[in-house]
Design a protein with these regions (language model features):
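C-terminal alpha-helical interaction module
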Residues: 1-343
Length: 343
């Protein structure tokens, strides 16, 4: 039987491996810089620059009196800035007076969207348009929303937690708890300024840096401040001494996310918080305060960072770990004599 001759298979034509790598690297680098420019504005040196918040009104003014069931907090559970407001709301006992509306980041739309339609809006940018038609700035969380005037009162978390601490005392279950007392304001403000630059925003300056020099500068400042904080907290329970303050709240929401996402995703990997002799127990101490753990959503944090920051994690794979036990004993009770809520 005559054999059938098979035609030789044509060679696959394509770019040589070296050229393919160069082309792919160039295309991805250009796309990365384009996406990072939208995600994280930068200076000429490649350092991340956080845009200022635009809505800066205050509850307690004539236009916005403190009233129960009038205001809502719009938050994202993964966001550390929004988390601050949830912690203070819980510590002050304002759960029945101020509602919480959850939004979540959409990886496809690149914006915050509501879990359910709210105030006639499906996305946060739509709500910003309701508050200020023609608004062209960033639509961020947290938001303090006034249902009576249908507008945004404030979207700056640093100011919102001051309002939540003091403006709503008439309707707060824990009105006696003062997280921003007059005799500690100077100390609190000093800590807030240092912690914001080096830690709260510092982790973002590491993760969103677009040059090696900008990253190394931010990382050095971050860990220098963490080392300083660890030394201070070796001898006192809180940053204000024996009293919990807003400075602790502002630090807590970054520390809670540190080992989970900032250590790996943002390349803040010189040392974990749980490895610090004072900062690790301090984090557990704050987490175990009444009402605080209920504001923490570990899975949302991992989902929102790893699943939505495409330029930093293009594959969108969410890690299983790390295993962190924040319910473990902290042994810091002996460092303070004053109770959290003075009756």
């Amino acid at each position: 039987m005559e054999a059938i001759a098979m035609a030789p298979r044509p060679k696959t034509k394509g770019l040589p491996p070296g050229t393919l790598i160069k082309v792919g690297k160039f295309a991805w680098t250009q796309m990365w810089h384009l996406m990072m420019a939208r995600l994280a504005p930068r200076s000429q040196s490649g350092a991340y620059q956080r845009p200022a918040s635009q809505f800066r009104q205050w509850v307690g003014s004539e236009a916005y009196p403190a009233e129960a069931h009038r205001y809502s907090l719009i938050v994202g559970m993964g966001c550390p800035w929004a988390h601050r407001t949830l912690v203070v709301r819980s510590l002050k006992g304002l759960e029945d007076a101020i509602a919480v509306v959850r939004a979540q980041p959409s990886p496809d739309q690149g914006m915050w969207v509501f879990e359910d339609e709210w105030e006639g809006c499906q996305t946060l940018p739509e709500l910003y348009q309701v508050a200020q038609p023609g608004y062209t700035g960033r639509a961020t969380v947290p938001v303090l929303w006034d249902s009576q005037t249908r507008t945004i009162v404030n979207n700056e978390s640093a100011e919102m937690i001051v309002m939540l601490n003091g403006a709503f005392n008439a309707i707060a279950a824990h009105a006696s708890l003062d997280l921003y007392p007059d005799d500690l304001k100077e100390t609190i403000d000093t800590w807030n300024e240092q912690i914001y630059h080096a830690v709260n925003n510092g982790v973002y300056r590491c993760g969103f840096a677009q040059t090696q020099a900008a990253y190394e500068e931010a990382c050095s400042e971050l860990f220098a401040m963490l080392d300083q904080l660890d030394q201070v907290l070796t001898h006192q329970r809180y940053l204000g001494g024996d009293r919990l303050t807003l400075a602790d709240v502002r630090l807590f929401t970054t520390l809670f996310r540190f080992d989970i996402v900032y250590y790996s995703l943002f390349k803040c990997n010189r040392r974990r918080i749980q490895d610090y002799p004072a900062l690790g127990p301090y984090l557990r101490d704050l987490y175990q305060m009444p009402g605080v753990a209920a504001t923490c959503d570990l899975q949302a944090v991992k989902r929102d960072y790893y699943g939505n920051l495409f330029p930093l994690n293009p594959g969108g794979i969410i890690p299983i770990g790390p295993d962190i036990t924040l319910d473990a004993p902290h042994h810091r009770e002996s460092l303070a004599q004053r109770s959290l809520v003075e009756e």
